[in-house]
Amino acid sequence: MTARTLSLMASLVAYDDSDSEAETEHAGSFNATGQQKDTSGVARPPGQDFASGTLDVPKAGAQPTKHGSCEDPGGYRLPLAQLGRSDWGSCPSQRLQWPGKEPQVTFPIKEPSCSSLWTSHVPASHMPLAAARFKQVKLSRNFPKSSFHAQSESETVGKNGSSFQKKKCEDCVVPYTPRRLRQRQALSTETGKGKDVEPQGPPAGRAPAPLYVGPGVSEFIQPYLNSHYKETTVPRKVLFHLRGHRGPVNTIQWCPVLSKSHMLLSTSMDKTFKVWNAVDSGHCLQTYSLHTEAVRAARWAPCGRRILSGGFDFALHLTDLETGTQLFSGRSDFRITTLKFHPKDHNIFLCGGFSSEMKAWDIRTGKVMRSYKATIQQTLDILFLREGSEFLSSTDASTRDSADRTIIAWDFRTSAKISNQIFHERFTCPSLALHPREPVFLAQTNGNYLALFSTVWPYRMSRRRRYEGHKVEGYSVGCECSPGGDLLVTGSADGRVLMYSFRTASRACTLQGHTQACVGTTYHPVLPSVLATCSWGGDMKIWH
């Protein structure tokens, strides 16, 4: 190389250095002359940080440079790092300080002919390549964080902690979590359960744990067992508020054995039915998850040691409480909505649902004994009359010519229709209830009133007494008579609980029971002032 060439290169370098010192604008954004201003000290939106993978490089990038050289062919310098910054994203070594101003960095407007390592990976803050790659590994969205890192980081930020906590988060230091706590957290994450949710029992198809039904009698029930039933008093206060179901509660029933009547059975749309101690403690004694779909109906066996359940999964189960085993399992041809035991032969029960027929099952053989067919689509409720030789069924027929199908009286032995001209109004009857002393029964109607009928043929409806004031609005709102027969109780679609005088049909009391529709009400068979109610919101209340 000649001496003239060397002198020319030296003059160019000197001219470039003097020009860069004379300039006052910082690098970072382009002006009209193609220069770039430094915006590293300006707060960037989260989407424009280097962690998001977006670089502040101009559309007209630099020419490809030679590796190992400090200057590009056009006489422009490479981007330099601002070493004096101590905020997030600067050079990791804080001991190095830049003595003066930042040197200006300019870029040519011409498009690069090929991709360059420097132009494609220069971060917005102009840090060295090693620091940029280190930051990219830690904060880039393209590299997912581990679950423990994400958890520790969220906890640290949520506490607004000290710099030590932030440094701990940045360095990925995760505290040790015992195995027992990790398993509990994993279980709560998978099932979505909280601390206040009741256990839901074993998975469907498995036998539940045995429920010990001791020989003792509740101290609240014992004084009333050997005495005559007193007049029913109107409850005013809530004794227990039972929560545990994750879906609407369909039905509730007290245990029919008086000495064990502290137990309450509830069915729900969450595929379970539960047994509660609703008199002494208000705790859930056992949860049964035998069904794969909603449990629409369940009944205590008259012995008080077994529960018959049926649901939308077409399955029927008879469960022994003391052993937890299934004494009977059957499969119906339709979704089940109502079940009733025969009042005399406790090995026989009736089953109705989304079908035009009802079926009588024998538990001893596990087979269908008899079928009762009508031109309907669904059976809403079944009610046995005294001695069990006759029973009533309410259906969903509500057309103009449905006077022969709304309520039907059947002969149990011959499966013949005794009468089908019982209810002549264009309303369906979602529930039926028998009076304990008088030869009458009640029918809940979608006309927002309770109708009174005779239990003796021809089953005439009373025109003088009609119990009005509540709302049904399509819900399966239940109704019942008190054990003494002097009061009637019904739920309402607006959550209220209403009581009527049986003799005068006047309203005796109104309770603001639930926030959603109250669909079930039942008096305690022994305690004269205890009432249980359930709602479509999944909760139950014990009134006293």
Curated annotation (Swiss-Prot):
Gene3D superfamilies: YVTN repeat-like/Quinoprotein amine dehydrogenase (2.130.10.10). PROSITE patterns: WD_REPEATS_2, WD_REPEATS_REGION. Residues 17-74, 183-208 are annotated as: Disordered. Expressed in heart, muscle, testis, ovary, uterus and prostate. The keyword Lipid metabolism does not apply. Residues 30-39 have a biased composition (Polar residues). It holds the Pfam family WD40. The keyword Oxidoreductase does not apply. WD repeats lie at residues 244-286, 290-329, 330-373, 375-420, 424-463, 469-510, 513-544. This is WD repeat-containing protein 25. The lineage of its organism: Eukaryota, Metazoa, Chordata, Craniata, Vertebrata. The gene is WDR25.
